[in-house]
């Protein structure tokens, strides 16, 4: 694979809103960056659960090397899933909570899904001894959550399918085998569980080498959507080593580019790929994604919703800085596999 890729283009059926739908200044509590947000439709409105890094700004980060002092998980609601977001007054999880387990450093990159009437979160979980993927249950009133299970290190980017398949919960995940794969060549795996606690029947699903525009790592993004042709599934893909990148962002040495691809998985056995779209679906191409923010050239979806109209909403973090929204018609997305 080439070390540096040429310019990439997203699918023409994708329509991006030109401005972020959520930014740091919108929050009612300290926030430097708000991004990587899970979204569901719940009790007649849209519920977003988002990552918030806080405690510094661009000037202090660049001049003083001051890193972020904390990460929290917050909740907001909207009638249309686009604007008018109403924020809970405080985060539901905060890394500076004095009562948290001392082994835990922080939770981040949340996804949210409803399965059989219960709300579940998938979270990245940084501990003193490695990074884990975690699953928690969120209360019906969205006020509290409890940890159900977490993986051993190192693992991340877990997403749950929105229903049981063959009587089992199913998740996608991205282990990080630094020694065996080399550098960041991390791939997507699938696991099953009877109860969200004990996970097994693990199977390899998609490798970096299967994605023509990736040379670094890939990983799950949002919970899949069930369609007549299979489970519509997004993934992120990373290419790196372009030294021209990162010059306008906070992190000047950032040379990676995050894009999104898609595949169809078998409805009855999602460990089988029905079809893989061989081009990027989403690429960073707007100024908010390429020329500003914490890390340039990053788009990172964490939610995908299918509306009754056939519109698919894709919520994604841009430049690790804000939340953006892209839309497409389901029929147009499925046609890309033909």
Language-model segments: which ranges?
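Structural signature of WD-repeat beta-propeller blades
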Residues: 108, 158, 222, 300-302
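Beta-rich carbohydrate-recognition and catalytic domains
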Residues: 1-105, 113-159, 163-216, 225-294, ...
